[in-house]
Amino acid sequence: HSIHRIARQMSDVFTGERVRVSSPQGRFTDGAALLDGHVIAGAYAHGKHLFVTFDNELTLNVHLGIYGNWTFGGDETFTGASSIGAPRKIGEKEYAAGEEQPYASPPEPKSTVRCRIVSEHGWADLVGPTICRVLTPEEVRTVRSKLGPDPLNSDADPERFYRAARKSGRPIGVILMDQAAISGVGNIFRAESLYRQEIDPLRPGKSLSDDELKRLWEDNKHLLVIGVRVGRIITTEPEDRPGVPETEAWPDHANYVYMHHGEPCRRCGTTIRVEEIAGRKLYWCPGCQK
């Protein structure tokens, strides 16, 4: 969900702006030179990939990975999130630009900044990405063709996810993290959607009914939409956090099972379990998810 927030932020503050693009770190110098001085046409997300399009038909493609993040700043016309991405634990701080100090020019970049984008009214710095590259239109199509459908995109076809699950003997908890099967579902959404739909994460994908697969798709879409709107991953229903509004749920009342191992389930009282599967920690309730 955070990549869709970044795409929205990029579109809001940079679309139609002629920008300077540089690489203070030096690792993206050649790519930055291809984009420097051009106008940003827009930005969109597909799963965990960000695509920023320019008027010369080239596209900046970024994947934050685990440690990457974008930082934004500017004058009173340049509003939005100050930092989006890792570190995940502190969430995102969002406030009107200029709240901290008047904008005159971007601050001196840190030596770790892979890519800096500067317009007349503000700037964006990228640090620690897994991917930062420039693509042609054909290369963009190739990258996107390898990605599964993104529930947040209006043109997403869930059938690709359904087919991937139906023919697989892998646990559904692993399939949900496979970006070639479904894009944008991270570790928290994986655990929480399976809990909410009362599905054992260790069940083979091919054992799930059409109804169960559809419910998983729709619930992940629902939770991702909330994530984009609120800026944090809130998966609990109001009745399971009485008196705690959605905007105040994070972190203590935000999730059912994620990071709650060893604690009693909110709904049935069974102890929440955690197990490492495919290199990531998977949380679930053995009582609710059978």
Label for each model-derived stretch:
Residues 1-290:
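Structured catalytic/nucleic-acid-binding cores of DNA maintenance enzymes
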